C-alpha cells in the first residue's frame, strides 16, 4: 500500500476511535439522540476528518441504520442497550467502528461481551488467504458459547476509497458459499452482531439515511428542482451515505425532494434493521488493514 494512503487510513481510524469513545460517554438517560449525533459528527470534523456516513444510533432490538432527523424527539432511557456506529474518512479513505453500551444497567454484560469477544477472535484469525467463511465459523462459535445467536444476514465489509461496502463480506456465521479470501492491503470492517432473538434481521421504518444511485442520470428527472438537487447531492456526498438532516441544512425544503427521488430510485433510503423476533442486539466493530502477519487495527 502506498505510504500516503496508509497514513490516511491510520488517521481516519484514530479520529473514528476518538469520536466513538467521546460519543459513548455522552449517552445517558434523557439525553437526546440528536444531541449525541451532532456532537459526535462535530467532533469528527474538528479533529480533521469528514464523515463516511451519518452517526448511527441503534437501540435495543434495532441492529443498525438509524440517524435522527432535525426534529427528532427520541432520548436515551435507563435500561437501553445502545449501538453507536461511527464512520470517518480522510480524502475518501474510510474508517468504520462501533461499540455497544448499556444505560445505567449491567444486565446486558453477557451479550455485550459476546459480540466484543467474537470481534477479538475474528481479528486474531484474519489473514491473507483465509476463507472468510472460516472467520464466520469462529465468530459463530464464540457468540454461541455465550448462549446467543449471531445475526446471519449482517456482515462485515471491505472498504475502498469513497466506497463503504466494497465487495468482500465477513459473515458472523459459517457460510459455505462464501469462498472469498482477503489479500494483503485489503481494508475491512469486521462487525459481529449478537442477539437473544431470531438471529436474522428484517427491514423496519426508514432510517433517515440516503445514498445516491450513481447509475441514474439526472437529465431524465423531469422536475427541475429535483434534478438540480440530485446533482447537488451527488457532488457533495459522492458515493457515501448522507443524513436527511444534512440535506435539510444545505438544501432548502429538501424533504419532499428526498421522498420523490427515493420513490423514483434515484436515491436509496435505507430501512432500519431489526431482529425478526425483536431480540436485543449488540455489536462491536473495528476496521483493519490486512498485512502479511495478519492485520492491523486502525480504529
Residue ranges of each PLM-predicted region?
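Active-site neighborhoods and metal-handling regions in enzymes and metal-associated proteins
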Residues: 1-299
Amino acid at each position: 500500500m502506498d505510504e500516503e494512503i496508509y497514513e490516511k487510513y491510520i488517521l481516519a481510524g484514530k479520529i473514528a476511535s476518538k469520536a466513538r469513545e467521546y460519543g459513548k460517554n455522552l449517552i445517558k438517560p434523557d439525553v437526546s439522540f440528536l444531541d449525541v449525533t451532532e456532537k459526535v459528527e462535530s467532533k469528527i470534523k474538528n479533529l480533521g476528518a469528514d464523515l463516511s456516513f451519518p452517526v448511527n444510533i441503534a437501540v435495543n432490538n434495532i441492529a443498525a441504520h438509524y440517524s435522527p432527523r432535525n426534529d427528532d424527539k427520541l432520548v436515551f432511557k435507563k435500561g437501553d442497550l445502545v449501538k453507536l456506529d461511527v464512520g470517518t474518512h480522510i480524502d475518501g479513505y474510510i474508517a468504520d467502528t462501533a461499540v455497544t453500551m448499556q444505560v445505567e444497567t449491567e444486565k446486558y454484560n453477557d451479550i455485550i461481551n459476546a459480540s466484543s469477544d467474537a470481534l477479538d477472535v475474528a481479528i486474531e484469525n484474519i489473514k491473507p488467504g483465509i476463507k472468510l467463511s472460516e472467520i464466520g465459523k469462529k465468530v459463530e462459535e464464540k457468540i454461541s458459547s455465550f448462549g446467543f445467536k449471531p445475526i446471519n444476514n449482517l456482515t462485515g465489509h471491505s472498504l475502498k476509497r469513497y466506497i463503504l461496502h466494497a465487495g468482500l463480506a465477513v459473515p458472523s456465521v459459517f457460510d459455505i458459499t462464501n469462498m472469498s479470501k482477503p489479500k494483503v492491503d485489503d481494508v475491512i470492517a469486521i462487525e459481529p452482531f449478537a442477539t437473544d432473538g431470531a438471529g436474522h434481521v428484517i427491514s423496519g421504518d426508514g432510517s433517515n439515511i440516503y445514498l445516491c444511485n450513481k447509475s441514474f442520470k439526472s437529465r431524465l428527472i423531469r422536475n427541475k428542482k429535483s434534478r438540480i438537487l440530485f446533482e447537488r447531492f451527488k457532488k457533495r456526498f459522492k458515493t457515501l451515505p448522507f443524513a436527511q438532516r444534512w440535506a435539510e441544512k444545505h438544501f432548502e425544503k429538501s424533504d419532499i425532494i428526498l421522498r420523490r427521488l427515493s420513490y423514483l430510485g434515484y436515491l436509496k433510503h435505507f430501512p432500519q434493521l431489526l431482529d425478526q423476533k425483536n431480540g436485543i442486539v449488540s455489536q462491536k466493530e473495528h476496521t483493519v488493514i490486512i498485512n502479511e502477519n495478519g492485520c492491523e487495527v486502525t480504529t
